[in-house]
Amino acid sequence: WPARWSAQVNRDQPDVALLIVGRWETVDRVNEGRWTHIGDPTFDAYLNAELQRALSIVGSTGVRVMVTTVPYSRGGEKPDGRLYPEDQPERVNKWNAMLHNAISQHSNVGMIDLNKKLCPDGVYTAKVDGIKVRSDGVHLTQEGVKWLIPWLEDSVRVAS
């Protein structure tokens, strides 16, 4: 991905860049041959290095980069009713804290709080402003996209 992203940034020469990452950073993953997840110091170091690399590549031309927080999700429940690990708010909070820390190290990078927009009460919800914004607990509905895009565009525009 680094070479592909670098080539794309150099080819497009954007005025501003929007980076939306994080869902996969909250799931259990195999790293260096063992299962791990955010919150494990070794995996956190790996995630942070990859995040720093992404921010450096996307912002390599000096362009303003905006990064969204990850919203809480509810992809489903285990048979016992508990949330799957990636849907646990603690993991999302850890990733978003990592984002905040990484962003603070780059003068051309800012944050858009997508979590607050999609979860205004601080917890997962499928409906916001009377609109069903999530279809499966993770992905946006068509109505959700129509509702979110103007806000997202304005957020990027204001930042640039």
PLM ranges: what are they?
Residues 1-138, 142, 146, 150-157:
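Alpha-helical cap/lid subdomain in secreted, periplasmic
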